[in-house]
Design a protein with these regions (language model features):
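Boundary at the C-terminal end of the N-terminal hydrophobic targeting segment
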Residues: 24-33
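Gly/Ala-rich beta-loop-alpha elbow adjacent to hydrolase catalytic centers
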Residues: 181, 201, 205, 209
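Alpha/beta-hydrolase fold active-site loops
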Residues: 121
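Bacterial N-terminal signal peptides that target proteins for export
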Residues: 2-14
């Protein structure tokens, strides 16, 4: 896509950062193939802003459930495009722009998803803290691409403020969103069938998934979902231990991705006073039936260690094998068993 006047300041900043980052991070990108244009459906509880800019179509206020399609495209860097190939992975989202947002009724979105998802059914993804709508669209596009979820992907965007200082406000908005998230999971299972709906949550969004699943299990104990994936889950480890027996029966599998180098989770543990589920090193032997993937051997894909699901090729490939091929941890290439329910993911040759 070509630049418009509103994009020029951001474009200039990107160019400067590209030049600096190629000096500071000389390793080439290991991300998946380029995103030229990618469209996916969304559900959101955000308010309409009335802005003509697609990325600003929704704000951070609470509202009723809406649905539609979001299209993300690459910025056209012209002759400077080769610099992007040398830039670190965590810069990739800055090379994307939300080009179009089309709001549709929920039934139309579900019909389109049914036509594109195939036999596996949809994969519902819930984002985490500090995610405005525009940033969320860009990261959702990267995650869909990295995990190869095209056609299956459905993004659930709750009204995070998109501001680093508003963590507790985001927590409140997440809890407010839980009934609609639970309703969405139930309706998807009713539409697509038993074990045909995968549910994925990242960071604070993983906490939302866990709590919503507890409500789903209470309301409909006979429901059967597919794979539940918790990426860098920002949730009290002890609370998850107590909730697990309630949600395990309704999921085909539950997989946790954790690492020792996750800085936001370390800060969350200090804030809350208890270890987080996404921190490697917890005693997970009592998490019966849960598969834990330890990513501590992977190289850092960014300054936070929190976004491996969108930047690490190895994590993307492991997710693809789990979510698309249905392979359990003991059969997936690249995993080395550590204990009864813990595997370490080895980096690929290109990471």
């Amino acid at each position: 896509m070509k630049l418009d006047p509103l994009t020029v300041p951001r474009f200039t900043g990107i160019i400067v950062f590209l030049i600096v980052s190629t000096w500071a991070f000389p390793m080439s990108s290991t991300a998946q193939a380029e995103i030229q244009s990618l469209e996916f459906p969304y559900f959101t509880l955000r308010n309409r802003t009335g802005s003509p800019e697609p990325g600003d179509a929704y704000g951070g206020e609470r509202s009723d459930l809406k649905a539609g399609l979001c299209r993300v495209e690459e910025l056209d860097l012209g002759v400077l495009a080769p610099l992007a190939d040398l830039a670190p992975n965590f810069l990739l989202e800055e090379l994307l722009r939300v080009q179009d947002v089309q709001e549709l009724d929920i039934a139309t979105v579900l019909e389109g998803l049914a036509a594109s998802a195939g036999e596996r059914g949809p994969a519902l993804y819930v984002h985490g803290y500090y995610i405005g709508f525009e940033k969320g669209c860009r990261r959702a596009a990267l995650f869909q691409q990295n995990a190869d979820l095209s056609g299956r992907f459905l993004w659930f965007s709750w009204p995070s403020d998109g501001a680093a200082a508003y963590y507790t406000h985001d927590e409140a908005d997440l809890y407010w969103s839980l009934p609609d998230l639970a309703d969405t999971i139930i309706k998807l299972e009713q539409r697509f069938g038993s074990k045909n709906v995968d549910v994925i949550g990242h960071s604070l969004g993983a906490r939302g998934v866990i709590l919503a699943l507890a409500e789903v299990a209470n309301r409909d104990p006979d429901i059967r979902l597919g794979h539940v994936v918790l990426l860098a889950p920002d949730v009290d480890f002890g609370i998850f231990e107590r909730i697990l027996p309630r949600i395990a029966p309704i999921a085909e599998s539950i997989t946790i991705y954790a690492t020792t180098g996750d800085r936001p989770l370390a800060l969350s543990a200090q804030l809350h006073g208890y270890p987080r589920l996404g921190e490697a090193g917890n005693d997970v032997s009592g998490l019966t039936g849960v598969e834990v993937i330890d990513l501590s051997d992977l190289p850092s894909e960014g300054p936070t260690g929190h976004l491996y699901h969108i930047y690490s090729r190895a994590v993307g490939e492991d997710l693809r094998r789990l979510l698309n091929a249905g392979e359990r941890a003991d059969g997936r290439q690249g995993l080395v068993v550590q204990s009864e329910n813990v595997w370490r993911l080895r980096p690929t040759a290109r990471e």
